[in-house]
Amino acid sequence: MSAEESKDLARRSWESLSERNPDLIEEFYPPDLVWHAPDQDIRGYEEARQYVSTFFDAFPDINITLEDVIAEGDQAVTRYTIRGTHRGETEEFGPPTGRQMEVEGITIHRIEGGKIVEEWERYDNLSVMQQLGLVPEQ
């Protein structure tokens, strides 16, 4: 893929999340996908759907803004901002706090055969926990 095609694929994968349809994962990722999230590795469609659905349940008004998309070789990098209100219970964030959060992150997408086969996700999870009042601010 060209750098522009890789950037477009990474961009569209994020835009699909805004549609809140976990089944769109199959459009951008192969069945053996691997996401390296800050606190766990997600492998395959079922784990990916569960991970995304849990996040949508916790933050039903989630808004994702792509700040930058760059690409070279078989990788694309996205820098984004996620905003949302904690309205659903999850194992990670507990019962709803009703608080808003905003977090910036970066994802490295590795692309093969027109699909994103592996991602490395980095964002400040501590900041999210502090904004939700789950841990004290420092």
Regions from the language model: what does each represent?
Residues 1-138:
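C-terminal and inter-domain tail/linker signature
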